[in-house]
């Protein structure tokens, strides 16, 4: 049976876009490194075409027997398609038993039909890294060595002692100290010599937490509770007695009582109601003779 029946026609549309995207991720440099690594371990030549040299599965099964002897008991050297697919299936099963992660594996058709050579390359690189992790020495430095599990067992006493240790997530106390600090609860006098504030001599000293008294003074202030006369010399307010009006009540500079009489009767005279005419004796009429409003 010819292998042409497994070949597919050209891809179009979305299938072609997906195929081109997968091919763009294929690394020719990694292919050359894999070629050197496989040929160095197996002693077999892959040939100019990497996919055609590995599609029969013979070289790959030989590689697994070098990494893990007896992992592939039987290698089919027939050119029949199902024999080649069987070799690829046995190689994939051997990788699983070798400890490969299932997400790093490829399918047989990915290599046989060249459907996804990028995944084939990823699987072989992961296999090289797994072999390096297990201590395989090779002339070609390829693959990433996986970190090994580091497990520690602690007794109960050690676990309880670790509960008193401050974790690094909480910060560090390397640069912290209590130098210069007084004991907790001790009385402290707060002052600052840089601001020329003298050390406190008594309990009436204002601490720095309340501000500073450097520029404050009581010059010109009388003792609390002392009677004070409020006046202003600029406004002409006299300070002779207690009848002086404070500035809060206004000022009397422009006010006076000239022409006012307190306690005496006042004659109300309105020229509109008192006609100016000669009396019988030739004298003006008296103010009391003026008729009131509404009188004739």
Curated annotation (Swiss-Prot):
Protein name (Swiss-Prot/TrEMBL): Calponin-2
Calponin-like repeat coordinates: 166-191, 206-231, 245-269
KW Coiled coil (keyword) present: no
Residues annotated with N-acetylserine modification: 2
PANTHER family named among the record's database cross-references: CALPONIN, CALPONIN-2
Alphabetical UniProt keywords: Acetylation, Actin-binding, Calmodulin-binding, Phosphoprotein, Repeat
Top-level taxon: Eukaryota
Occurrences of domain Calponin-homology (CH) (ranges): 28-132
Organs and tissues of expression: Smooth muscle, and tissues containing significant amounts of smooth muscle.
Protein family: Belongs to the calponin family.
Gene: CNN2
């Amino acid at each position: 049976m010819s292998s042409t029946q497994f070949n597919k026609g050209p891809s179009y549309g979305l299938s072609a876009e997906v195929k081109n995207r997968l091919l763009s991720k294929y690394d020719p440099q990694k292919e050359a490194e894999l070629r050197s690594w496989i040929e160095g371990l197996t002693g077999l030549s892959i040939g100019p075409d990497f996919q055609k040299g590995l599609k029969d599965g013979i070289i790959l099964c030989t590689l697994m027997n070098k990494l893990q002897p007896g992992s592939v008991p039987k290698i089919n050297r027939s050119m029949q398609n199902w024999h080649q697919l069987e070799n690829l299936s046995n190689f994939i099963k051997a990788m699983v038993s070798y400890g490969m992660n299932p997400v790093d594996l490829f399918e047989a058709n990915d290599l046989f039909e060249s459907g996804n050579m990028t995944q084939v390359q990823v699987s072989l690189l992961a296999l090289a890294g797994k072999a390096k992790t297990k201590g395989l020495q090779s002339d070609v430095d390829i693959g990433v060595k996986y970190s090994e599990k580091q497990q520690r067992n602690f007794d109960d006493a050690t676990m309880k002692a670790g509960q008193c240790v401050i974790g690094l997530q909480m910060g560090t106390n390397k640069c912290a100290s209590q130098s210069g600090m007084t004991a907790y609860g001790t009385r402290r006098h707060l002052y600052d010599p840089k601001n020329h504030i003298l050390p406190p001599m008594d309990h009436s000293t204002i601490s720095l937490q309340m501000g500073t008294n450097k520029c404050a003074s009581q010059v010109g202030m009388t003792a609390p509770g002392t009677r004070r006369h409020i006046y202003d010399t600029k406004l002409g307010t006299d300070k002779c007695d207690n009848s002086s009006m404070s500035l809060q009540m206004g000022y009397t500079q422009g006010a006076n009582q000239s022409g006012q009489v307190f306690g005496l009767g006042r004659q109300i005279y309105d020229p509109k109601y008192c006609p100016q005419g000669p009396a019988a004796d030739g004298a003006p009429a008296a103010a009391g003779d003026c008729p009131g409003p509404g009188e004739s």
